[in-house]
Amino acid sequence: MDYPTLLLALLHVYRALCEEVLWHTSVPFAENMSLECVYPSVGILTQVEWFKIGTEKDSIAIFSPTHGMVIRKPYAERVYFLNSTMASNNMTLFFRNASEDDVGYYSCSLYTYPQGTWQKVIQVVQSDGFEAAVPPNSHIVSEPGKNITLTCQPQMTWPVQEVRWEKIQPHQIDLLTYCDLVHGRNFTSKFPRQIVSNCSHGSWSFIVVPDVTASDSGLYRCHLQASAGENETFVMRLTVAEGQTDNQYTRFVTGGTVLLLLFVISITTIIVIFLNRRRRRERSDLYTESWDTQKAPKNYRSPISASQPTNQSMDDTREDIYVNYPTFSRRPKTRV
């Protein structure tokens, strides 16, 4: 092998090792794990093949409705399929006694008629769980049947190169949409749920989950990356339950109602206390004035009414008479 050929071969191996593999679903490694592969459309299944992706594709198993199932020797004792699922386009691969060597990327390729080839890539990673490692930035609560829009907008002003939306569950992460804005490529999702998204140049991104149900509850992550390596991540929790609404709006309305009620109660209490004190003061002043009027001495005689009978006893009409007279000095007379 000449030098240029060797260099090209090494370059090919390097690119294969370093190039990021776009996956549809990521699952944590376990000794007994399952790699889900369910074809969502209706079609005639002609062949299914599983591969492990490394520097090369390593065939694990192949299935044909005509020729049956063949599992390659390195995996014959460690993987299996459920017979009950093979007739319904469900070619989920099950592992038993898996080892750390089984960490990596796997590909499930289905050949159907008349749709053609359908492929799903699954990543197996070392992880204890996914939800605990990503605390949400916000929480959205909704009733079933609504269309929910999830939005993320970066704080920085750098141009966005890649946008990735994911749904995070304890047992797996599903890629909802991937946009390569530089090369104009959109990665087709294999998520078994219709998700509407925008893949256009801009400073923000959104997805729409139409007609939500309880199964749509969970964490949703938006990852934005720039060409220079800058990146931002937003995590939102969606809860779908009967009789629930957006908790932020509910808290706002409830808080405003409580504050308004407290304000009305305070104003009413102040007015009632003020009126009670005013009435007490008025009653006290009236009582004092009446009492002083009754105790005041009279220095006049009330005239006799002309309507009184003339033969009325003088004793009955007798009243106290007060006469003002000068005060005379009582000095003793001087004797001559």
UniProtKB/Swiss-Prot annotation:
This is CD226 antigen. Residues 19-126, 135-239 form the Ig-like C2-type domain. PROSITE patterns: IG_LIKE. It comes from Macaca mulatta (Rhesus macaque). Glycans are attached at N32, N83, N90, N97, N147, N186, N198, N231. The chain crosses the membrane at residues 255-275. Residues 298-319 are annotated as: Disordered. Disulfide bonds join C37-C108, C152-C222, C179-C199. Residues 19-254 are extracellular. Phosphorylated. Keywords: Cell adhesion, Cell membrane, Disulfide bond, Glycoprotein, Immunoglobulin domain, Membrane, Phosphoprotein, Receptor, Repeat, Signal, Transmembrane, Transmembrane helix.
